[in-house]
């Protein structure tokens, strides 16, 4: 195994995240996870959308820390297949699933604001703040998460092209151990460990969120075009938190 960086992630010596990322780029994904679990702030968690390729990070993290909290934000608008996929992976991998939901029900939100996702960028941003960003921020705070693992990858969209392996947001460290993986890397990992894609993958869904703002991929489209009517890729979680 490649030697892991010895310094603690919380030490003043690692205020230079560029140098730290340069070290981590040379490690395998499992080594990055091992390093972050050993040297990062004690309370770690993984967030997962249980989307198209989510089984990779769920397996990667649960193999090294079986009881790591796995945060799922249930917006109330997920595909039925996503709920069933979450159930199946939770059972198979024995996940410590922590489901967080918005403070306001979908019916009450629609009574107050209408169908926000149909109200342009302003409505989409308000929707994302209510249904996704606020619950995620609450989850991270209530679980006192100091080391936050994600499945972000640079190849997923232009906006993620510069995703570092480790970044600092306030006092929290955000770790993306497969940031440099390609779709082929993901496929190879899933095949090697006999893990499934999301059930909708075979129907042409390459990025899966809420049912009303997700569409099938078609020739000529970028992956990011399949979300939010092509207006944007990010829901705000990885921009605002």
Swiss-Prot record:
Where does the record say this protein resides?
Cytoplasm
Q: In which pathway does it act?
A: Sulfur metabolism; hydrogen sulfide biosynthesis; sulfite from sulfate: step 3/3
The alphabetized UniProt keywords are: Cytoplasm, Oxidoreductase
Against InterPro entries, the record matches this protein to:
PAPS/APS_Rdtase, PAPS_reduct_dom, PAPS_reductase_CysH, Rossmann-like_a/b/a_fold
Reactions that this protein is recorded to catalyse: [thioredoxin]-disulfide + sulfite + adenosine 3',5'-bisphosphate + 2 H(+) = [thioredoxin]-dithiol + 3'-phosphoadenylyl sulfate
GO molecular function terms listed in the Swiss-Prot or TrEMBL record: phosphoadenylyl-sulfate reductase (thioredoxin) activity
Show the CDD domains listed in the entry. Answer: PAPS_reductase (cd23945)
What is the E.C. number? 1.8.4.8
GO terms (BP aspect): hydrogen sulfide biosynthetic process; sulfate assimilation, phosphoadenylyl sulfate reduction by phosphoadenylyl-sulfate reductase (thioredoxin)
One Pfam family recorded for the sequence: PAPS_reduct
This entry carries the following GO cellular component terms, namely: cytoplasm
Q: Locate the active site.
A: 235 (nucleophile)
Q: What class of enzyme is it?
A: oxidoreductase
Q: What does this protein do?
A: Catalyzes the formation of sulfite from phosphoadenosine 5'-phosphosulfate (PAPS) using thioredoxin as an electron donor.
Name the family the entry cites. Belongs to the PAPS reductase family. CysH subfamily.
The protein in question is named Phosphoadenosine 5'-phosphosulfate reductase
Q: Which organism is it from?
A: Xanthomonas oryzae pv. oryzae (strain PXO99A)
Q: Which gene encodes it?
A: cysH
């Amino acid at each position: 195994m490649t030697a892991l960086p010895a310094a603690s992630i919380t030490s003043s010596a690692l205020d230079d995240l560029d140098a730290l990322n340069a070290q981590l780029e040379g490690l395998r994904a499992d080594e990055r996870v091992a390093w972050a679990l050993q040297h990062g702030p004690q309370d770690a968690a993984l967030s997962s959308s249980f989307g198209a390729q989510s089984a990779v990070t769920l397996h990667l993290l649960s193999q090294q820390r079986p009881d790591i909290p796995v945060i799922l934000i249930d917006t109330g608008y997920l595909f039925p297949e996503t709920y069933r996929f979450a159930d199946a992976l939770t059972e198979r991998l024995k996940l410590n699933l922590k489901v967080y939901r918005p403070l306001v029900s979908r019916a009450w939100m629609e009574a107050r604001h209408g169908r926000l996702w149909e109200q342009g960028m302003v409505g989409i941003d308000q929707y994302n703040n209510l249904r996704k960003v606020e619950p995620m921020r609450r989850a991270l705070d209530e679980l006192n998460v100091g080391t936050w693992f994600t499945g972000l990858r640079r190849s997923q969209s232009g906006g993620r092209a510069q995703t570092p392996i480790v970044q600092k947001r306030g006092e929290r460290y955000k770790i993306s151990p497969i940031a440099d993986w390609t779709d082929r890397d993901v496929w190879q990992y899933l095949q090697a460990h006999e893990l499934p894609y999301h059930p909708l993958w075979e129907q042409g869904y390459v990025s899966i969120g809420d049912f009303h703002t997700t569409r099938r991929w078609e020739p000529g489209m970028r992956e990011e075009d399949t979300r939010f009517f092509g207006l944007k890729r990010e829901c705000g979680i990885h921009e605002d938190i």
